[in-house]
């Protein structure tokens, strides 16, 4: 019996070691992302992310059915998203964390991710990003959510909270809640000058809580995606204070007018469909007429209207900033 028990123990250790190697190799590689829908039903895969975190490429496992509830929507005043150590007590949940990509990078080689955000190495994301498993990523509805995280149980942990934004997905069966962090975000949880020591730990225990997102000086921004055309509009929504995520986007066209004068709004809202991540799309059987107004709804049910934020002469792969923001 003792020998049988010992064999079981060795087997368990082996499985844990194999899982650690698997995570180190992949993180939330772009290979795991949903294919990006494009006009005409053609789809393609994003490029692979960095493999700096250790072993050869191997296929990802099938995602398990999540059993953990999604974290609660943050209340105003519960923490902050600026990385400070203050902000409300309680509400901490247990999770595990890994990291991928370059040690001081933002995760993916292309500084993107399954949410569709771009240049997450730059402010306001500043590489403080994370992949989330299903209770965090929520099939894309969790994109843009902000979480305070703090590591526990390792000598290099500072114990101070840092704030990360969900920009990518990872469905590896590590724990009920799993943050696969950028190298920058993982190292930020360490004591001074012990960042590399903490990163070398691989998988660590952390605590987390959802907090309101704060983007000082920024308004809600809309990026018209490459491939958009008169009968297909795809829009990335960014920089929403509060919940940080979006559960519905609606578009209002303008009436056609002659003489080069912009038309007035039609007053009719057309629901857009979630394409992938934080990108919403509208396919039509008629040429869309701008300027376009957009109405976004967050997880708390609050709505925000950006009147005629996208002009009639809009262009693909262009950013249009609104003058509105969630309170």
From Swiss-Prot:
Signal sequence range: 1-30
Organism: Oryza sativa subsp. japonica
Family per similarity comment: Belongs to the expansin family. Expansin B subfamily.
Function noted in UniProt: May cause loosening and extension of plant cell walls by disrupting non-covalent bonding between cellulose microfibrils and matrix glucans. No enzymatic activity has been found. May be required for rapid internodal elongation in deepwater rice during submergence.
Disulphide linkage map: 115-143, 146-213, 151-157
Record's bilayer topology term: Peripheral membrane protein
Subcellular localization, as worded in the UniProt entry: Secreted, Cell wall; Membrane
InterPro entries membership: Expan_Lol_pI, Expansin/allergen_DPBB_dom, Expansin_CBD, Expansin_CBD_sf, LolPI, RlpA-like_DPBB, RlpA-like_sf
Cellular component GO terms held in the UniProt record: extracellular region; membrane
Region (Disordered), start-end ranges: 30-88
Domain Expansin-like CBD: 231-322
TM ranges: none
UniProt entry keywords in alphabetical sequence: Cell wall, Cell wall biogenesis/degradation, Disulfide bond, Glycoprotein, Membrane, Secreted, Signal
Superkingdom field: Eukaryota
Sequence ranges of Pro residues compositional bias: 57-75
Domain Expansin-like EG45: 112-218
Residues listed as glycosylation sites in the UniProt record: 45, 52, 82, 298
Protein name as annotated: Expansin-B7
Compositional bias of kind Low complexity: 44-56
Gene3D superfamilies with a match to the protein in the record: Expansin, cellulose-binding-like domain, RlpA-like domain
One GO BP: plant-type cell wall loosening
């Amino acid at each position: 019996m003792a020998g049988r028990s010992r064999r079981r123990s060795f087997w368990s250790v082996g499985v844990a070691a194999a899982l650690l190697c698997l995570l180190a190799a992949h993180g939330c590689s772009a290979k795991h992302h949903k294919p990006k829908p494009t006009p005409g039903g053609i789809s393609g895969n994003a490029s692979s992310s960095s493999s700096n975190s250790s072993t050869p490429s191997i296929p990802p496992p099938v995602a398990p059915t999540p059993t953990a509830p999604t974290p609660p929507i943050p209340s105003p005043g519960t923490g902050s998203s600026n990385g400070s150590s203050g902000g409300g007590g309680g509400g901490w949940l247990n999770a595990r964390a890994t990291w991928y990509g370059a040690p001081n990078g933002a995760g993916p080689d292309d500084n993107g991710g399954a949410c569709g955000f771009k240049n997450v190495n730059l402010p306001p994301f500043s590489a403080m990003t994370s992949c989330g498993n299903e209770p965090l990523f929520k099939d894309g509805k969790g994109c843009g959510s902000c979480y305070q995280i703090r590591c526990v149980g390792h000598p290099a942990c500072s114990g101070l909270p840092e704030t990360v934004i969900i920009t990518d997905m990872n469905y590896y069966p590590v724990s009920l809640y799993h943050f696969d962090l950028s190298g920058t975000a993982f190292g930020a949880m360490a004591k001074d000058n012990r960042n590399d020591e903490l990163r070398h730990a691989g998988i660590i225990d952390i605590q987390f809580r959802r907090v309101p997102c704060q983007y000082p000086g920024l308004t809600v921004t809309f990026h018209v995606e490459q491939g958009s055309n008169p009968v297909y509009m795809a829009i990335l929504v960014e920089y929403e204070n509060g919940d940080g995520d979006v559960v519905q986007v609606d578009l209002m066209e303008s009436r056609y007018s002659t003489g080069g004068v912009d038309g007035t709004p039609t007053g009719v809202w057309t629901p857009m469909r979630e394409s992938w991540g934080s990108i919403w799309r509208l396919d039509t059987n008629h040429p869309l007429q701008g300027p376009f107004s957009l109405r976004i709804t967050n997880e708390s049910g609050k709505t925000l209207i950006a009147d005629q934020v996208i002009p009639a002469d809009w262009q693909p792969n262009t950013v249009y900033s609104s003058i509105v923001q969630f309170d």
